[in-house]
């Protein structure tokens, strides 16, 4: 299974979202559909999760890392995760939906208990090491 996530940054914080069906925050992203590239999936998921009033340039996505991990929901399932960094400013308004309960501009002052395993184990350490968040 292939999954994508996109990192948006503002004021040394990363944008994460809280799905209504999950206890933890995750990256903006989701599954790669059949006949779709990871980049196409990342762009589609950003449109879906951020809502119609969020504005971003689709040419500003950069693949930063990819790795394998075990699915939190099913330990027998292996996931290949692609992480993109958005090189620009996210404009407009973020819109909650049936799927997404809320958004958070995260920095380390929030701690790690609210984070998905992918954020906790891979993404946030990368962001801290590269001075992308505080």
What residue spans do the PLM features occupy?
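Conserved active-site beta-strand element of glycosyltransferases/polysaccharide synthases
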Residues: 17
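A generic "binding-loop/recognition-motif" signal
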Residues: 21, 38, 90, 111
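Conserved N-terminal beta-strand and adjoining loop/helix that marks the start
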Residues: 1-14
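Functional cleft and adjacent loop/helix regions within the main domain
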Residues: 28, 34, 70-71, 100, ...
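The catalytic Nudix box helix
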Residues: 27-64
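Short strand-connecting beta-turns/loops that link adjacent beta-strands
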Residues: 11, 20-22
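Active-site-adjacent beta-strand/loop module that shapes the phosphate/pyrophosphate-binding cleft
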Residues: 2, 65-93, 104-109, 126-127
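Nudix hydrolase/Nudix homology domain
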Residues: 23-25, 96-134
């Amino acid at each position: 299974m292939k999954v994508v996530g996109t990192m948006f940054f503002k004021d040394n914080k990363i944008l994460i979202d809280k799905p209504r069906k999950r206890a933890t925050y995750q990256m903006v992203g989701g599954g790669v559909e059949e006949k779709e590239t990871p980049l196409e999936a990342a762009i589609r998921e950003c449109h879906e999760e951020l809502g119609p009033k969020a504005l971003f340039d689709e040419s500003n996505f950069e693949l930063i890392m990819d790795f394998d991990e075990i699915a939190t929901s099913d330990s027998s399932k292996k996931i290949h995760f692609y992480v993109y960094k958005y090189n620009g400013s996210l404009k407009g308004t973020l819109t909650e939906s049936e799927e997404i309960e809320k958004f958070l501009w995260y920095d380390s002052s929030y701690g790690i208990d609210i984070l998905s395993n992918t954020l906790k184990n891979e993404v946030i350490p990368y962001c801290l090491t590269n001075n992308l968040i505080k």
